UniProtKB/Swiss-Prot annotation:
A Pfam short name: UDPGT
Keyword Signal included in the entry's annotation: no
Designated name of the protein: UDP-glycosyltransferase 90A2
PROSITE patterns assigned: UDPGT (PS00375)
Keyword Glycosyltransferase: yes
Domain of life: Eukaryota
MF GO annotations: glucosyltransferase activity; UDP-glycosyltransferase activity
Source organism (scientific name): Arabidopsis thaliana (Mouse-ear cress)
Protein EC: 2.4.1.-
Lineage of producing organism: Eukaryota, Viridiplantae, Streptophyta, Embryophyta, Tracheophyta
Keyword terms: Glycosyltransferase, Transferase
Enzyme class: transferase
Amino acid sequence: MELEKVHVVLFPYLSKGHMIPMLQLARLLLSHSFAGDISVTVFTTPLNRPFIVDSLSGTKATIVDVPFPDNVPEIPPGVECTDKLPALSSSLFVPFTRATKSMQADFERELMSLPRVSFMVSDGFLWWTQESARKLGFPRLVFFGMNCASTVICDSVFQNQLLSNVKSETEPVSVPEFPWIKVRKCDFVKDMFDPKTTTDPGFKLILDQVTSMNQSQGIIFNTFDDLEPVFIDFYKRKRKLKLWAVGPLCYVNNFLDDEVEEKVKPSWMKWLDEKRDKGCNVLYVAFGSQAEISREQLEEIALGLEESKVNFLWVVKGNEIGKGFEERVGERGMMVRDEWVDQRKILEHESVRGFLSHCGWNSLTESICSEVPILAFPLAAEQPLNAILVVEELRVAERVVAASEGVVRREEIAEKVKELMEGEKGKELRRNVEAYGKMAKKALEEGIGSSRKNLDNLINEFCNNGT
């Protein structure tokens, strides 16, 4: 059967970590080969437009701006992306996210001027877009930046109230549906299990997002079937909402890399090239663009890297590392401050043999696709649950352990870094991640990959039936 013309609307949340995988999804949709043409319209705000234009250069995607509201309490003027917030705490994240609802009227007005929409994919944080889809009569799918494992574990913890009566932050409790997995209170957002939390603005926002998700036509995950088969199978059997695993989306840009010739090689790439030419292995260190790390913890990380004696490239915000650190490590380390780097290119560099990561899902999938083993240092949100997946289930990562006061000490960091880069454990993790990296590449192969087939099924379902 010949497919009708397909028009997909994408609306990513206003954060680079959320935009990037959805823009990769846009490229995947536009590269899809079947009888009907696909058009993609991406919604954003004026100040985010340049980043999206650059990310989708060379494609036929249409980009539509919707104004972000002015004078939002607590949000500095001119901020339209969470990366620009002074700090990503609930006191700023919640009003920023709530403010996006003020865009709804303009969003719907723009939608009505577009060609018929086959379906919309919008971020789970943009809960109000479900109402827009219902009013205008097209299906909405929710895009989640989490993996399936974290989603079903979270669901089990809340449905079973597993941690409501647990007093200790570190007491392990088995997840009923997955008894081999143990979670702790400290793996979740602080005070999430306090009865008083139900009146908290952040908790209410989560409830709105979950309610909206349950009214949608399904969820798209940036994962692939062979990466977490137990959890994907469980979700499909137990949940009413449909699931489509269409990742790893970071692979979508790979075909462009050979075509784009860099005019000016960045300093960090030159440094990596020098290390490669000298036969030196490098640890890549990055904790995401929005991580909040105490000065004490930063100091311990720095001293741990210094003590480890390994070569490292550290992408860091600000200038809060202890005095004299860079002079002491010399050519063994390179600091990249307040600069946007191409993380995928770093991880794919021949010299990079390990990744000290905060366990954001984008970072973990990029590391797996690049076949680089991970030292897990989860900081917030669902990152501790992501760490459980890569450490205990996939065995592509080792995890640092915090001392009793909650700080990971320099000795622990130095020991785990050396083991990852030079030890037997590191070799085992490298073998495992190489196997998953090959599976990841196969998942997106045209015509035979599981994620390609899942995308085919998604398009067929919503474009032939129109429901």
